[in-house]
Amino acid sequence: WNRNPEYYTESDWRGTLDKEGGSALENQAIHTFDLMQWLTVPIKTVEASCSTKRHKGVIETEDTCDVFMTGPNGERLVFFCTNCYVKNAPVELEIVCENGSIRMVGNLVTTELDGKTETKDFSSGTVFGKDYWGSGHGFLIEDYYTRLAAGERFPVSGEEAIVSTRLLHAVYSSAKNHEVIRL
């Protein structure tokens, strides 16, 4: 995405270590990062680099982060996020497997399996906030209230949710200490 310096200076918490903790990854790309780990294999190693490229002297946190991860059988996962892009483009996530792939760009999901390609639009029609955030927030909010009213369990438990938090901590630790983190 594109975050200009004013985005950070107009708030007392954005871009600060003690109040925000992180910027490009922890604040902007966290839902995509969470989705990536949820859709793929358990992460076993993390090697990351986080830096401030465009917003030097403006923020204490990162505006760019790249992460190389491996799974239990040597699967490779690469994640990149930045707030230095020239526009607020839709989120992109691609998972390439032995026999097929899934590619998400915004609300469009394209699957390829056995030489057949199918694209589905998962737009909910309800967008909370900016359109490049996607419509996932609308789905989640609606599902939350529906399940709450019905007394149903939520699809993700606290134990499952902590996986992304631990992974996020490993990314920042790897970037800070310039080392591979084993999970």
Regions found by a protein language model. Name each.
Residues 1-58, 178:
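Predominantly a Rossmann-like dinucleotide-binding segment in NAD(P)-dependent oxidoreductases
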Residues 21-23, 128-132, 150-154:
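Active-site rim elements
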Residues 28-31, 136, 159, 163:
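A generic structural signal for residues located within well-ordered alpha-helices
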Residues 32-33, 137-142, 168-169:
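A general structural signal for well-ordered alpha-helical segments in protein cores
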Residues 42-43, 98-102, 171-174:
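Phosphate/oxyanion-binding loops and surfaces in catalytic or ligand/nucleic-acid-binding neighborhoods
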Residues 53-62, 72-139, 157:
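NAD(P)-dinucleotide binding in Rossmann-like oxidoreductases
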Residues 72, 143-183:
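C-terminal helix-rich "cap/oligomerization" subdomain common to oxidoreductases
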